[in-house]
UniProtKB/Swiss-Prot annotation:
It is an enzyme of class 3 (hydrolase). InterPro entries: Beta-glucan_modifiers (IPR050732), Glycoside_hydrolase_SF (IPR017853). GO terms for cellular component: cell surface; extracellular region; fungal-type cell wall; plasma membrane. Its main location: membrane. It comes from Aspergillus niger (strain ATCC MYA-4892 / CBS 513.88 / FGSC A1513). This is Putative glucan endo-1,3-beta-glucosidase btgC. The lineage of its organism: Eukaryota, Fungi, Dikarya, Ascomycota, Pezizomycotina.
Length: 684
């Protein structure tokens, strides 16, 4: 959704410049070939004869010079699952220990600081090869000049979805750009040095290994983060974490006794077990094995005496440890039984589960609180949704949190009964299904999403995962359909014809597979409202159109009617005489960040054109939501939650990229936002 210098236009590219061999052409012509002139630039929603112009594009990724340094600033949003650098385990050691596994939403500026790409050289978010909420799979290219910069590409030609606008990269022939060692991006690294985090944008186009790769497990630790230093070459004692606590304590106490006994003979080597931190002592066990000087020199008689005493102490320690372990195990069983009984009688805590697995469910206090928001109303036919942290391959190191998805679903179920996803990577679909099950949302339905890319590896992986999800489902009635690609034609740039051929091929492949497996699900795609044509409609089982009045520079007083008129004149006629479903796949309004005056029109003041703000959002909601509910219009609202990381796409005067949510990233309804209750009427 949105991007740098985004506008609603049929003529210019994303840099707002015409090329030397181009001239401005408006597609809105009268019967006499005269050009329309409207208050919204080139766009007239009443003109049925509009024909979209081909969109220019520049190819490829750029790369970062290998000597480029990285700047690190990061904090965590209060109330989130993450631990920040101020907490024990923050920073690189925390990442090495998996602290980021439960990463929740970072604040916008800090999320941006985790990327090592200057804002001025970032492509717009809707570049074909960028990661956005509707593209959590393919990363943004870093700075460099191995490939042409997408900044040279022109303004977008139309409104968009929830990724930023930018140059379209090639879609033709399912090709993957080749690379040479000099073209390798630092983003391809699986660790990315000390700046790696769950919000970094990595390249998915190369599997090369780099000398800059840093394995956090290999970094020397000075212990100042509160965790004990694990010695090189030492056996990993962390696997013993599940040993009953009393048994471990008994063993540590025995080791401490041995250490004190040796001290009587003035031995200098440290005890292999004695430490105030049991974990640290265990971790250092093998350090003492490098030189076994427990008895040392002296008379043989004294050696025998010491040996006999030590043998007796060791036997006593073994017996004591065994007894302690048995008693501890019995006590542990008793505590577990008592805890289970208490849990079953009084419910679980805010972070607990009645299943005892640490995962939230409908009986968790936190979930009960989230599902009891009187300011939310189930009036949206559908909501676009991308779980947090599902960028591949980064999610392999920092998996998204099931509890975060469950929290999101607890909120979303108060807004809608239908959710749309954009891809299958990183188990996002499985986590949504798990959340639906844990919350027992029997009325919730899901539109499956598949991300289509020029990189055939990405596309094949996504489609393969789609097949697994559907075939492994106990009941496919929860699925409403499969959306193969989002705005693949727009991102194809001028090579739209080849892109359309490839896209139709993917759609047909999925349809054939479902037919062979006796799976009855509609298959189609979603794209800009003016990118649909008869050929694509013929291949798809439904038509999904992304329509955003904000980027047309439409004033808020006209936004609702403009959206309806545009949809009715551009898209619904394509399915006349068929039973194919028509759906607006994205529509919304930002809550702040400036104003947009449409194609080729620079706003003269901050009140002109489409103004982002809470009041404007409320007006659009009040004039669109209940009316659509009454007339049965099918649409997906973009979007429920802010995405702070998209602050990197903001530009002066156009700072709305991270502000499209009804709620902030912590799932709090934004102050002043009023979701209509439509007189108590809800989506069925």
């Amino acid at each position: 959704m949105a991007g740098v210098n985004r506008s609603f236009s049929y003529s210019r590219g994303d840099d707002a410049l015409l090329r030397d061999d181009e001239r401005e052409i408006s597609p809105l012509r009268s019967a006499e070939d005269g050009l329309y002139s409207t208050s919204y630039g080139d766009v007239s929603p009443l003109s049925a004869g509009v024909q979209a112009q081909n969109r220019p594009f520049d190819r490829g990724l750029v790369s970062v010079p290998e000597g480029q340094t990285l700047e690190r600033h990061m904090t965590s949003t209060p109330g989130m699952d993450n631990l920040g650098p101020a907490s024990v385990g923050g920073g690189i050691s925390g990442i090495a220990l998996g602290v980021a596994n439960s990463h929740n939403r970072q604040s916008g500026v800090d999320a941006f600081r985790e990327t090592d790409v200057p804002v001025r050289n970032l492509p717009a978010e809707r570049d074909f090869n960028t990661t956005g909420s509707d593209n959590p799979y393919i990363p943004a290219p870093p700075d460099g000049d191995i490939y042409p910069s997408s900044e040279a590409v022109r303004y977008r030609d139309s409104y968009s979805s929830h990724t930023g606008l930018g140059a379209g990269a090639p879609f033709a022939e399912h090709s993957t750009p080749g690379t040479t060692p000099s073209q390798r991006s630092f983003f391809d690294s699986p660790y990315q040095g000390v700046d790696a985090g769950p919000y970094q944008r990595h390249s998915a186009y190369s599997s090369h290994d780099y000398p800059l790769v840093i394995n956090p497990d290999d970094i020397a630790d000075d212990g100042d983060d509160g965790f004990p230093v694990h010695p090189k070459g030492a056996a990993d004692y962390r696997s013993n974490a599940n040993v009953p606590g009393t048994g471990v304590a008994g063993a540590a106490a025995a080791g401490g006794f041995l250490g004190k006994f040796r001290a009587l003979f003035k031995r200098e080597e440290p005890s292999p077990f004695y430490d105030s931190d049991i974990g640290g002592g265990l971790g250092g066990a093998e350090k003492a094995q490098g030189g076994r000087h427990i008895i040392g020199g002296g008379s043989r008689k004294r050696g025998w005496i010491v040996g006999l005493i030590l043998a007796a102490v060791i036997v006593a320690a073994i017996v004591g440890g065994a007894v302690g372990g048995i008693l501890g195990h019995q006590e542990h069983d008793g505590d577990t039984s008592s805890s289970s009984s208490s849990s079953s009688s009084s419910g679980t805590g805010s972070g607990g589960s009645d299943k005892g697995d640490g995962l939230l469910d409908k009986d968790s206090d936190e979930i009960k609180a989230l599902m009891n928001n009187k300011n939310l109303h189930k009036v949206f036919p559908g909501v676009d949704y991308t779980p947090w942290g599902v960028q591949y391959p980064l999610c392999l190191q920092y998996p998204p949190s099931q509890n975060n998805v469950t929290r999101d679903l607890a909120v979303l179920t108060q807004l809608t009964n239908t959710i749309r996803l954009y891809g299958t990577d990183c188990n996002q679909t499985e986590m949504v299904l798990e959340a639906i099950d844990r919350l027992q949302l029997t009325n919730m339905k899901l539109w499956l999403g598949v991300w289509i890319d020029t990189n055939t590896t990405t596309t094949d992986r996504q489609i393969s995962q789609l097949y697994k999800i559907v075939e492994n489902a106990n009941d496919t009635s929860i699925f409403k359909g499969a959306i193969v690609g989002n705005e693949a034609l727009y991102r194809a740039g001028s090579d739209v014809a080849s892109a359309e051929t490839n896209l139709i091929g993917y759609i047909n492949d999925v349809k054939d597979h479902f037919k062979d497996k006796n799976i009855d699900l509609p298959v189609g795609t979603s794209d800009l409202g003016d990118n649909w044509n008869a050929q694509l409609v013929s291949a798809a089982d439904f038509v999904m159109s992304n329509i955003h009045p904000f980027f047309g520079g439409v004033e808020i007083d006209d936004a609702a009617s403009w959206t309806w008129t545009f949809w009715q004149t551009h898209d619904t006629p394509l399915t006349a005489g068929t039973n194919k479903q028509q759906i607006i796949s994205e529509v919304g309004w930002p809550t702040g960040g400036g104003n947009d005056c449409g194609s080729d029109n620079k706003c003269q003041n901050d009140k002109q054109g489409a103004v982002a703000g809470i009041d404007e959002l409320n007006q659009f909601l009040s004039e669109w939501v209940c009316q659509a509910l009454d007339n049965g219009t099918e649409y997906f609202w973009f979007e429920a939650f802010d995405e702070p990381w998209k602050v990197q796409y903001n530009t002066p005067g156009q700072e709305w990229e991270d502000k499209w949510g009804l709620m902030d990233s912590a799932r709090n309804l934004k102050p002043g936002v009023k979701i209509p209750d439509c007189g108590g009427k809800t989506i069925t």
